[in-house]
Structures are given as C-alpha cells and as structure tokens.
C-alpha cells in the first residue's frame, strides 16, 4: 500500500538519559531495587522521554467508538444501541472513564468512527467511516479504504495530543461486540485456536461463550488466507475502533509519546501494531491484567509487565487510567527522593 506511514521507525530510546536515571536510582535513600517495578518504570520513562527526571502530568485519553456487524450473530450480552448511548454518557460525564479523566486532569477525546445510527453529539468528534463494520462471519469487516481511515483516525488523535504537550497517551474503546472482533483478530494474527482467547466479554454465560467461539471459528475458516498477516487480519475481522487504537499506538511511538495500554481489546490493537512495526514496542506500557481469559496470553506474547491486576473487564481505557497514579508516583519518587549524599545517610558498603 502506498504511503504506509505505520512502517516509519519509532523514535529511539535515549540511552544516556536512561543510564543517568538508573545511576540516580542507585543513589536514592533506599535499598537498591526495593521499589521494584516502580524503579524500572521511572528509568524506562527517562529513556523514552529523553530526560533524567521523567513526568506523566499531561495526560490525553482518546476513546474510539464504532459498531460491529458481527453482533447480528448473537455474540454479545448487550444490544447494539448501547454503543451510541455510551457516547452520550462519555461526554455528559457519567461514564467510568469520564470520572477518571476528571480526577486525573486529563484531556478526553471522544471519537465516533461509525455507530449504526448516526449521532449528532456536541463534544464528540464525528469521523464516521461507516454505519458500523460488516458482519465478518460472512465477509470482510471493512474495506482496505475504511481500515486505512481508521488507522489514520488514531494517528490524528495522537497528533492532537502532541500539539498540547501530552506526556502520556491512553487509548480506550467502545463498541458492542468488540471482544468478539478482538478475539478473532488475535487468533488470526497469532494463528491460534479460538478457545485460547475467547472469553465472556461483557458477561456471557458458558453457553454464550461456546456460541461466540463457534462464530469466531467459522470466521477464521472463512478468512484463513489472512492468517498471520496483521494488517489484513485487522481489516477482515476487526473494528474501526480497534484499527484506530492500532494507528494510535504506532503514532505514539513515531511521535515520541509514551502509550499506556488498557485491557484485552487494546492489547489486541497493541499486538497488531507491534507485528506491523516491532520498533513501536518500546513505547507501550501496560496498565493492567484484565479478567478476560485471553488477556494473560496476550501480555505474555508481548512480554508485558502490567502495573495492576484488579480483575477489571470494563474497557473504555479505565484500567490504564487507574494505573496513571502509579506512573506519576514512580516519577515523583524518582525525582523527589534524596540521594544518600544529599541526606547525609550512609550507603551500603561496596
């Protein structure tokens, strides 16, 4: 494809700054390694941000929304109109991510990529690509043109975030049926059996999970030619919001903004991004390990060390948002603690 912007290499890690941050960590008034993952996080951020003392104060949360044709197969516990209703809830301040964004002083960017029924909501950026995706149980979920538009929508949100000095980017999603789409994409990319990744989503019972698994298996057989191909798996089996998340993660790496990845659906988008452009992996932090059974497998595949494990399964970017205070505190500890010399505290003998 022409103008394959997503193949542009990610920005390089600033190794001298990472080493300077590590040296500082080793001089802070605590036993070496005693703050464990928080120490590693601060040092990692220093290398990514190119400064010895990193920060995560300026936060951007983008919520990408779109409907899914595969809902016609009866794979969701909720009706399709909930997608549009939740867009109202996001901008009216009543959703979980809305509350979290307020508490974290984050910019909330709500993007409608294609609900079934067109919406006219103040506070939502309407970038409609279609009236939801097509039913991937019978054909491709989207055309290449639609898929590229969705990737670009994610990139555009990151460019907006960069323009206001964002230090940490969170992508969230809303779309009834999107755990089905995400599971199908991941199975195709990883060429693995559906039962390994398929779970209850928003609350299916055992019978519902079995039906959802069968639908995905039929779709994987239909689109078998795309197996192992991340871009075409995304376009044939994914959703507009999953493609936008993929584009956002790729753009974050290219523009030098750290991305904090949410749960299962966002991790599938991260998987596609990394398979398309492995250099973007360094720029992805992972907020939590969710309750969806396949999430653990994805995190292991991505060699990710999530910050939280609370059994969450909401989506919306909520798990990543809940991890932001930990990221900020890791920075504050790194930046604000005294060294042994400054505090006149004896260090451990060499």
Curated annotation (Swiss-Prot):
CDD domains: DMB-PRT_CobT. It comes from the Bacteria. GO terms for molecular function: nicotinate-nucleotide-dimethylbenzimidazole phosphoribosyltransferase activity. It is an enzyme of class 2 (transferase). The keyword Zinc does not apply. GO terms for biological process: cobalamin biosynthetic process. Disulfide bonds: none annotated. Keywords: Cobalamin biosynthesis, Glycosyltransferase, Transferase. Its EC number is 2.4.2.21. Pathway: Nucleoside biosynthesis; alpha-ribazole biosynthesis; alpha-ribazole from 5,6-dimethylbenzimidazole: step 1/2. It holds the Pfam family DBI_PRT. It catalyses: 5,6-dimethylbenzimidazole + nicotinate beta-D-ribonucleotide = alpha-ribazole 5'-phosphate + nicotinate + H(+). The active site is at residue 316. Catalyzes the synthesis of alpha-ribazole-5'-phosphate from nicotinate mononucleotide (NAMN) and 5,6-dimethylbenzimidazole (DMB). Belongs to the CobT family. This is Nicotinate-nucleotide--dimethylbenzimidazole phosphoribosyltransferase. It comes from Pseudomonas savastanoi pv. phaseolicola (strain 1448A / Race 6) (Pseudomonas syringae pv. phaseolicola (strain 1448A / Race 6)). The lineage of its organism: Bacteria, Pseudomonadati, Pseudomonadota, Gammaproteobacteria, Pseudomonadales.
